[in-house]
Amino acid sequence: MASQGTKRSYEQMETGGDRQNATEIRASVGRMVGGIGRFYIQMCTELKLSDYEGRLIQNSITIERMVLSAFDERRNRYLEEHPSAGKDPKKTGGPIYRRRNGKWVRELILYDKEEIRRIWRQANNGEDATAGLTHLMIWHSNLNDATYQRTRALVRTGMDPRMCSLMQGSTLPRRSGAAGAAVKGVGTMVMELIRMIKRGINDRNFWRGENGRRTRIAYERMCNILKGKFQTAAQRAMMDQVRESRNPGNAEIEDLIFLARSALILRGSVAHKSCLPACVYGLAVASGYDFEREGYSLVGIDPFRLLQNSQVFSLIRPNENPAHKSQLVWMACHSAAFEDLRVSSFIRGTRVVPRGQLSTRGVQIASNENMETMDSSTLELRSKYWAIRTRSGGNTNQQRASAGQISVQPTFSVQRNLPFERATIMAAFTGNTEGRTSDMRTEIIRMMESARPEDVSFQGRGVFELSDEKATNPIVPSFDMSNEGSYFFGDNAEEYDN
């Protein structure tokens, strides 16, 4: 990409660092995950969790949510100012599951936010360690991406449910910073912008006054983030139009929806990082591993290696399939909800099935579910190979626009062709090419029409044996083309509701 010189790498965004060399980046990412691990160990001690209970992914999620809530400044301020019945603004908590005489019991715990903040800072050398918090947010976001469908959210903003592959990071909180912006899909950014424009249409003071000026700055910043994800001049030029609009309205919404559709073939660059549950880092730290000294990367072999030797458990409902639960968490760990299933299956070494065929609900257990019948099982999070995570959309010929697939945003940098039904996508582009953006629209449609599904993406890139940590011998898989690659086909997942 043209602006590569000024871009910071993921790890720099992740750790809030300026330009660093590879070793410094590995050390600062290591420091970040090491801090998460130390915090987790301390919380397990506070809560007197047994080793088994500390490895339970549901307990890990509760502890992660507590620290995110403790540091959520805006929400804390809001709760202070709008006291609601039964919510103590100074406390945070959630369900902790314990093993009692052969059964799992749920215990609701409550902690002072101040106390949680103290434990977190203490684990992070006295710093706020915002990077670690963002890392946890991205893990939760990746879990949501693998678990829930966003059809309703798409339809509400006037987008097509078939654009689900563009929705990575749609549940990330606004405060997730540069690292969060990097992992958001094109559809997510479009949706945020459309919501903003709609508010402006309905509330005439939205863009006015001192507040309106701040709103405008946020609007332009979001436009620039989205523009940076597009890889063709015409798509970027359209984003400039949207950003510079005096009074954003329906014309801009139309343009944004057009751009979102175009991203199904002319894919945007969206970052992928393997963010693991806090308990995994905790286990490693407890076993004496020094992340900062060894260094760590979110996009290389490290997360794969960590998962090879971590045993994590999950609660299982009576009619759920433990193997399916494992697949869900594996996909979340590697940010692979939008990856081609052929590629995921090859790397994992076991068949990864579409979500419609999974016999499992989400990982979290609702407070009204019956614990009597709950069982637990080991999550199988190991893989056969590892591959480098990508931050490109996998477009061919010199990273310019080319073949895409109606439902894939590649996670792994592995050679494959991108099957897509051009007719299906092009049908969405009939008609409207008039207006200010007509020449750009025409250009985008022309590029899409010339895309060939048989083109190969990530030419020559392969997966690596887990013993090949320096990535010296790429194994380039050959894929059976007849297979449909999308996780979302025949989808019957629950909607994501806050």
From Swiss-Prot:
Family matches, as InterPro entries: Flu_NP
First and last residue of the signal peptide: none
Motif mapping: Bipartite nuclear localization signal: 198-216
Keywords: Capsid protein, Helical capsid protein, Host nucleus, Host-virus interaction, Ribonucleoprotein, RNA-binding, Viral nucleoprotein, Viral penetration into host nucleus, Virion, Virus entry into host cell
CC annotations in GO: helical viral capsid; host cell; host cell nucleus; ribonucleoprotein complex; viral nucleocapsid
Pfam families, per database record: Flu_NP (PF00506)
Chain positions covered by the region annotation Disordered: 1-21
Motif annotated as Unconventional nuclear localization signal, chain positions: 1-18
Compartment(s) of residence: Virion; Host nucleus
Tree of life domain: Viruses
PTM characteristics: Late in virus-infected cells, may be cleaved from a 56-kDa protein to a 53-kDa protein by a cellular caspase. This cleavage might be a marker for the onset of apoptosis in infected cells or have a specific function in virus host interaction.
Biological process annotations from GO: symbiont entry into host cell; viral penetration into host nucleus
Oligomer status and interactors: Homomultimerizes to form the nucleocapsid. May bind host exportin-1/XPO1. Binds to viral genomic RNA. Protein-RNA contacts are mediated by a combination of electrostatic interactions between positively charged residues and the phosphate backbone and planar interactions between aromatic side chains and bases.
Role this protein plays: Encapsidates the negative strand viral RNA, protecting it from nucleases. The encapsidated genomic RNA is termed the ribonucleoprotein (RNP) and serves as template for transcription and replication. The RNP needs to be localized in the host nucleus to start an infectious cycle, but is too large to diffuse through the nuclear pore complex. NP comprises at least 2 nuclear localization signals that are responsible for the active RNP import into the nucleus through cellular importin alpha/beta pathway.
Family: Belongs to the influenza viruses nucleoprotein family.
Name of this protein: Nucleoprotein
Protein source organism: Influenza A virus (strain A/Chicken/Scotland/1959 H5N1)
